[in-house]
Amino acid sequence: MSRRILIAGNWKMNMRAESGASLAKGIVDAVGKSPAVEVVLCPPSVYLSGVADAVVGTPVELGAQNLYAAEDGAFTGEVNASMLTDVGCRFVILGHSERRQLMGETDACVAKKLHAALAGNLVPIVCVGETLEQREADDTESVIETQIRGSLEGLDEARAANIVIAYEPVWAIGTGKTASKEQAEAVHAFIRELLGKMFSTEVAEQIRIQYGGSVKPGNAEELLSQPNIDGALVGGSSLKVDDFAGIIKAAPSA
């Protein structure tokens, strides 16, 4: 079935208020009024409102990089789903490898955030991926399956079609290395097959699976042309208008 390509820019801990607003406006101009693909910008939480102002009334959507699973309360420094929707977010990135590695986030933690996101009418982008050591040990599929089953724990078939999976090989993030189109497609196909076993083939065909890992204008077309790659979660290349626009333009319209 046809799945609309989703290109999401993860700004990570970069930009400032003025430069972020300028970047967002530049991307809005580059995208135009009727893009063939869905475009999401995920700035640092302190700049969500400013970027929201820049994209309001345009096809470009707003996303967050994380959330806390609880509702209002004594959770200093945290931001919940209600707060994110309040400032205009529609998407939220969950379980990024940097948070798994640096913040000690577990699959169980990601699952709690997943359910909080869905309850708050956010579309979760759930990240999974293997390290170089795991790939070289031929453990990619077992690692991915463990992460997906754990991160989607308790998710029923009725809501499963509302999520996005992002496959981000850890060894390709910020390293300049990129999985070949064959490597990426093989893992994406495995993920879709796994989702079919967990839910149903029909639901698995609806779930978008992004690739993330040093996506650039120069490799975007060959990656996004693969049958099971439904978009990109873009890091460094989302910080420059021309680079991000190049990735968007490289995406097929189906």
From Swiss-Prot:
Keyword terms, alphabetized:
Cytoplasm, Gluconeogenesis, Glycolysis, Isomerase
Pathway field: Carbohydrate biosynthesis; gluconeogenesis; Carbohydrate degradation; glycolysis; D-glyceraldehyde 3-phosphate from glycerone phosphate: step 1/1
The Gene Ontology terms for molecular function here are: triose-phosphate isomerase activity
User: What gene does the UniProt entry assign to this protein?
Assistant: tpiA
Catalytic residues, chain numbering: H96 (electrophile), E168 (proton acceptor)
InterPro entries with a match to the protein in the record: Aldolase_TIM (IPR013785), TIM_sf (IPR035990), TrioseP_Isoase_bac/euk (IPR022896), Triosephosphate_isomerase (IPR000652), Triosephosphate_isomerase_AS (IPR020861)
**HAMAP family, alphabetized:** TIM_B
Localization terms from the record:
Cytoplasm
Q: Name one GO cellular component term.
A: cytosol
* Location (main, coarse): cytoplasm
Q: Name one GO biological process term.
A: glyceraldehyde-3-phosphate biosynthetic process
Reaction catalysed by this chain? D-glyceraldehyde 3-phosphate = dihydroxyacetone phosphate
State whether keyword Cytoplasm applies. yes
Q: Which family does it belong to?
A: Belongs to the triosephosphate isomerase family.
By its UniProt entry, which NCBIfam families does this protein fall under? tim
Q: What does this protein do?
A: Involved in the gluconeogenesis. Catalyzes stereospecifically the conversion of dihydroxyacetone phosphate (DHAP) to D-glyceraldehyde-3-phosphate (G3P).
Q: What is this protein called?
A: Triosephosphate isomerase
Please give the subunit comment from the record.
Answer: Homodimer.
Q: Where does substrate bind?
A: N10, W11, K12, G174, S214, G235, G236
What EC number(s) does this enzyme carry? 5.3.1.1
